[in-house]
């Protein structure tokens, strides 16, 4: 039993009754679990963790695009790859979960960086950036310009900046108005085209909307 006076408990009981979390049986004058409590319990038991839901969406992204889909989160100045769905194509991106690459030269990283302030960006990186290929952005000023384009487009792009012959289109996954992860489609150069990139953006945006709706309904849970 609750160790509290009846005068303190009754307002709570009235509120829970009004909202159908409990109800009183007229014959016994005892309170029972109401339909709202039952609904909450069913929703909890049927929920998927955020990661499970995102992985389901990643399967769909790969099925629609025929390309590799990856999920990443920020780890200081790096993007940490936490999930991947391989392309069914014989020639595809070779990468692995657990790998880390710099935020500044990856599509996933730029999607995560795009809505940070210039001050935050400058605190993360030196003026001159390490080049991984001849196409890698070379300076922090160039990065800031690219992030402005990312904000205008609503998605990030990266063309052969970490691996030659590999291109990436990415969107952020936002919760409470801040990016908490990013989702990408990776496409080999010999398969990419303007129409292919446009298709990838559409697929990613539709997945982004579903995932962010899930976040709003259930919160963010990357648990097991």
Segments from the language model and where they lie:
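Extended hydrophobic
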Residues: 135-210
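Cysteine/selenocysteine-centered motifs that mediate thiol-based redox chemistry or coordinate metal-sulfur cofactors
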Residues: 120-125, 208-224
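N-terminal helix-turn-helix
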Residues: 1-52, 213
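Amphipathic alpha-helical regulatory segments at dimerization interfaces
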Residues: 1, 53-64, 153, 210, ...
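A structural signal for short hydrophobic beta-strand segments in well-ordered beta-sheet cores
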Residues: 22-24, 71-72, 173
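Conserved acidic, metal-coordinating active-site core of Asp-based
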Residues: 132
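Amphipathic alpha-helical effector-binding/dimerization core
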Residues: 32-127
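A cytosolic small-molecule/anion-sensing beta-strand core signal
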Residues: 26, 35, 75, 175, ...
């Amino acid at each position: 039993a609750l160790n509290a006076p009846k005068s303190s408990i009754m307002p709570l009981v009235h509120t829970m009754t009004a909202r159908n979390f409990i109800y009183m049986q007229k014959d016994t004058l005892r309170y029972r679990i109401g339909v709202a409590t039952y609904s909450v319990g069913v929703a909890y038991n049927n929920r998927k963790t955020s990661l499970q839901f995102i992985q389901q969406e990643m399967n769909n992204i790969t099925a629609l695009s025929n390309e590799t889909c990856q999920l990443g989160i920020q780890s200081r100045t790096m993007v940490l790859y936490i999930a991947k769905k391989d392309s069914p194509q014989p020639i595809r991106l070779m990468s692995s979960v657990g790998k880390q690459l710099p935020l500044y030269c990856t599509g996933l990283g730029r999607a995560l960086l795009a809505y940070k302030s210039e001050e935050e960006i400058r605190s993360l990186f030196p003026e001159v950036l390490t080049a991984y290929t001849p196409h890698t952005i070379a300076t922090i000023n160039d990065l800031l310009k690219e992030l402005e384009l990312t904000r205008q487009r609503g998605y990030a792009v990266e063309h052969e900046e970490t691996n030659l012959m590999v291109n990436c289109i990415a969107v952020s996954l936002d919760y409470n108005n801040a990016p908490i992860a990013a989702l990408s489609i990776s496409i080999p150069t010999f398969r990419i085209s303007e129409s292919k990139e446009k298709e990838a953006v559409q697929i990613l945006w539709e997945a982004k909307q579903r995932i962010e709706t899930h976040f709003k309904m259930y919160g963010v849970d990357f648990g097991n």
